[in-house]
């Protein structure tokens, strides 16, 4: 009886209290984004936190936080080092749960899913080399002796763009003298010649000269620049790679260009390197796919036996199309250029629509010249699809054969040892890689791990993490969101971040 009376009294008290006390809401169910952030941090408390914050920043076109570990990696590169099973689980979770209702940041999950997909994807390459001979992403090859500034390749989200400046070597030959690019919002220029100001460095970031100081340079929006031999390697935070090989011929400096993108990318591409749609036959149709190339495009400009069946008139007509109508479609304007200019110059200053005066081909070389050039190209391991361009450059300009560069990936040999605490790693504040529990040094990345702090900058910016990551209520098990990404704005001013600006010193043989 006493127990019943006590329960009755407590019941009355509870009803009375519930009528007067405010209702406290129960904790909200963790969102898809919350669960993903938890999983990334659970994988690696320090690197995973930086990775999640970086991808979040990238999804809104913001500057990423400073690295808190010794490895000199982009967000994509770090993600690719995550165990395969973990990446597969995240991919499945995003695809099955991203309905929009639970997702607090669709742009974040969309970008993360794209990055994960790229880690499982093959890459494809486009090239512009020598007196420029171009190979598209779909393996179409052609010769492009023109003068001016051109859109080499551009993605539909406009976070990836590369432009090439071609400069006359003589009346009939031209070379790549400068390359400009948009690296996810950072405007980078590389000038083998005609730099916008007198500096010993060929590199410019948002119009100001920079030096690599013998190590990887971190770009504000997550990309990196490093020097490997004579190759400058620019890596996008999303994984695309540009290799610039700095060379010389006839007293002039020039650049061979190799561009690597993902075969499975959801982006569409435009420019001289084609649309990467696996169709070799539409790479010469112009910007709006509305050009009508001469029928000669079916034949090779360089040494293909079928060329002998084509008339000289048809051949010249084809080359004329490439250097005029096709070229004009891909010229940049004062509104679209990414290049830096000295006072009084603009893109028109580097344009000559009369060029070349005469269209020359391998067929204009005598048999002995062709044979000697071919032998040297073969000895250097030049591939079949670039053989014609190599013979041309050897025969006319004596340019040494240049095989496609294949530097080591930044992730090669990297082991992610456990970190006990964050280690600030910026362009101005460099760190000594921590020791393993065994006392041995961590394995080195392809670039220097041991770095010193440089004088001259004391306002080092650090990022505090105030995010609370909610532990998921159930294991990750992972609907593709709408793409809300906006194109990254190009910064035309000097960046304000921890990156210092330091003044100072299959295969198809084809048409190029």
Describe the function of each predicted region.
Residues 4-12:
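Sec-dependent N-terminal signal peptides
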Residues 6, 281, 298, 339, ...:
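N-terminal start and proteolytic maturation junction detector
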Residues 14-18:
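Sec/Tat signal peptide C-region and signal peptidase I cleavage site
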Residues 20-108, 113-424:
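Von Willebrand factor type D
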Residues 414-512:
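Extracytoplasmic low-complexity, disordered linker/stalk tracts in cell-surface/secreted proteins
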């Amino acid at each position: 009886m006493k127990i019943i009376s006590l329960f009755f009294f407590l019941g009355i008290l509870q009803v009375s209290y519930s009528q007067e006390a405010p209702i406290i809401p129960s904790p909200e169910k963790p969102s898809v984004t919350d669960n993903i952030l938890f999983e990334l941090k659970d994988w690696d408390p320090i690197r995973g936190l930086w990775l999640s914050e970086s991808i979040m920043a990238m999804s809104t076109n913001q500057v990423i936080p400073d690295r808190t570990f010794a490895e000199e990696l982009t967000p994509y590169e770090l993600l690719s080092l995550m165990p395969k099973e973990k990446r597969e689980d995240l991919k499945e979770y995003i695809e099955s749960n991203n309905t929009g209702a639970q997702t607090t940041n669709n742009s974040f999950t969309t970008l993360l899913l794209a990055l994960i997909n790229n880690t499982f994807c093959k890459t494809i390459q486009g090239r512009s080399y020598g007196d420029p001979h171009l190979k598209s992403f779909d393996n179409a090859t052609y010769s492009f002796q023109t003068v001016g500034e051109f859109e080499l390749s551009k993605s539909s989200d406009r976070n990836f763009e590369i432009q090439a400046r071609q400069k006359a070597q003589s009346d009939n030959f031209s070379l790549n003298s400068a390359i400009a690019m948009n690296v996810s919002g950072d405007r980078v220029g590389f000038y083998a010649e005609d730099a916008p100001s007198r500096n010993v460095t060929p590199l410019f970031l948002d119009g100001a000269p920079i030096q690599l100081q013998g190590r990887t340079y971190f770009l504000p929006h997550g990309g990196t620049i490093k020097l490997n031999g004579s190759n400058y390697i620019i890596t996008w935070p999303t994984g695309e790679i540009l290799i610039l090989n700095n060379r010389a011929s006839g007293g002039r400096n020039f650049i061979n260009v190799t561009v690597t993108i993902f075969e499975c990318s959801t982006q569409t591409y435009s420019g001289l390197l084609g649309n990467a749609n696996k169709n070799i036959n539409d790479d010469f149709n112009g910007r709006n796919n509305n050009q009508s190339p001469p029928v000669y495009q079916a034949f090779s400009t360089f040494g293909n036996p079928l060329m002998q069946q084509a008339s000289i008139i048809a051949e010249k007509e084809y080359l004329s199309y490439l250097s005029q109508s096709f070229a004009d479609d891909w010229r940049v304007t004062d509104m679209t250029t990414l290049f830096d200019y000295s006072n009084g110059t603009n893109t028109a200053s580097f344009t000559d629509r009369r060029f070349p005066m005469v269209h020359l081909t391998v067929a204009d070389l005598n048999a002995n010249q062709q044979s000697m050039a071919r032998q040297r190209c073969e000895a250097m391991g030049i591939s079949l699809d670039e053989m014609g361009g190599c013979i041309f450059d050897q025969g006319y300009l004596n340019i040494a054969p240049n095989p496609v560069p294949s530097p080591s990936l930044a992730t090669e040999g990297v082991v992610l040892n456990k970190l006990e605490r964050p280690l600030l790693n910026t362009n101005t504040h460099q760190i000594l890689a921590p020791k393993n529990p065994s006392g041995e040094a961590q394995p080195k990345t392809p670039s220097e791990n041991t770095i010193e702090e440089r004088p001259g900058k004391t306002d080092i910016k650090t990022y505090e993490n105030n995010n609370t990551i909610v532990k998921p209520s159930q294991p990750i098990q992972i609907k593709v969101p709408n793409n809300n990404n906006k194109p990254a704005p190009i910064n035309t001013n000097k960046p304000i971040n921890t990156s210092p600006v330091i003044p100072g010193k299959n295969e198809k043989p084809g048409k190029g």
